[in-house]
Amino acid sequence: MSSLGQIVSAVEDYRKLVAAKVRTARSDQRVGQELLARWREVKERIGTTVTPTGLRLPRLALPEMDDPGEIARFLLEEGLPGEFPFLTSAYAEQYLEPAAPPPNDEATNQSDPISEEPTRLFAGLGLAEDTNERFHYLSRNQRNKRLSTAFDGPTLYGTGSAADGVLGKIGEGGVSIDTIEDMERLYAGFDLDQPNVSVSMTISGPAPILLAMYIGAAKRRFGPDVMPKLRGTIQADVLKEIQAQNELIFPIDASLRFLADMVDFCSKKMPRWYPISISGYHIAEAGATPVQQGAYTLSNGFSYVEYFRSRGMDVNVFGPRLSFFLDCGLDIEYLALARVCRKIWAIGMRDVFGADRRAQLFKLHTQTSGRSLIAADWRNNLTRTAVEIVLACMNATNSCHSNSADEPFTTPSEEYARYAAHAQSIVLEESGLFKHMMNTLSGSPGMKIVGNAVEDAILEEFRNIDEQGGVVGAVERRYQRSQIQASSHILERQIYGGIRPLIGLNRYADPDESWPEVPMIRTPREKKQRQRERLDDFERRHAGESERCLDRLSEVVESDENVFEELVKTIEHCSLGQITERLCDVVGKFRPMV
């Protein structure tokens, strides 16, 4: 039995434990009285908030119960916010505003956003200075600067901008990064050493090289002791690359080794950095159902835990630095998907891997569904994204990226990127859905029914993967890819057969609709040429040191030393393309699955 089989057993055992505790609470008078006393104490500790209209509400919504068995069931199945099994949320007061004075107090007229707003907006276009300008635009009114970075195709594949055949791809769909100097330009003007600034990088294949460049750029600006202060996330999810994207560069064994070295380094030296974001988003966008997204994301996560432990790494050291990334679409499963993932992760980490509380937390970034956005009657995408934001917040996501309505046509324009950001602000700051009270819908019959069905389906998918020999065995048999492809095919048939409504496309379509005049955002040829010239200049200036650094990197890869620790030195004199080429010479190249 692989760890997935053990996790299925652990979740089933937890269900049995809950049932046993419920029976005991009802049959043992002493236990029942203790639970009733605890319930009263919990409710007495809850503070109150006052809405702008003067309504006084508890800051935490709890059901009215006087049956010890139901109290036991609620505490063990739902849990209080921030308490095992974290079904409600990972933290106690996630979106709540500070406790407010009465509405006639002058302080209520002061506009102050929630203390840790979850808004993250994805940006990446052209050269480093172009994306830097977009970052400053998107964050100009934000107290917390959350810089989420998209990279262009050559960067994602670790290819230098001077390589043959890539000129037309430079800066398209993301930012072009070749050297540590590009990285300095990318985040210029942001205080990377401050707690209100964090950086996210959506890149997996060459992730260790890019993170090394980021560390190097931060050291140049803020000094050699800056690493413990850096906040952010890098994706680095090599398993989902095989299952859904094919942007892997190195063979799977080497990729896992490089990843483990980076996670080990960051866990010990960068306590505010997440060196991996275990990602279901791309799995969902490739065509997976919500259940498949949850099952493959969780199973990949547990596989990483197994692998890191096999390398002698301590789960209580690296566990708190694992993060997750899920898609949120419009299917009803999204009412509870992230909640269920949080619960399964906590049980698996605690009961199978012996992790402590910090390592049990499923820390989640959510992005609204890109696949749900369509070109037909495209302004409806504003509504689709708004609904998805509400669903994401109902699942207590820790951060959120909302897509721009014009994405079916082009890289997000400034106008619609602003609307996407404001949609989150309207949901969390303007509306009262989440800022006054935690747990508004947790425990509701509908949410419980959906959650239980999703949990059962995820465990069944775990059993299927376990029968394939675990995640790696299933990957080798193309199991996940084939399931994703089949689900994608079914979805398309449902859409074009009219079974699945898409407003403006197969229902209530406007026959007179004309396509909008949306300017295509492209990187001018002169900028692409400038990027090549910068790369040539960097490699020429460092020609004396680069070969020596690459030779030393090769030695480290062939030994048992930490590769990432050496990369932090290598990037000072070598470009992304040079490093990738040398690593491929040593470990080989990944052969994409077709």
Segments from the language model and where they lie:
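Active-site capping/gating regions of soluble enzymes
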Residues: 295-299, 323-504
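Catalytic alpha/beta active-site cores
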Residues: 23-334, 352, 356-365, 393, ...
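Generic secondary-structure signature for well-ordered alpha-helical cores
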Residues: 16, 143, 188-192, 219-223, ...
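Residue-level marker of motif borders
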Residues: 167, 174-176, 390, 438, ...
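Conserved active-site and cofactor/substrate-binding residues in soluble primary-metabolism enzymes
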Residues: 126-130, 142, 178-181, 205-213, ...
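A short glycine/serine-rich beta->alpha loop
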Residues: 197-203, 288-289, 372-377, 408-411, ...
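Poly-acidic low-complexity segments
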Residues: 191-193, 226-229, 237, 251, ...
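Flexible, glycine-rich loop/tail regions that form catalytic "lids" or insertion modules at the edges
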Residues: 1-136, 144-153, 425, 429-594
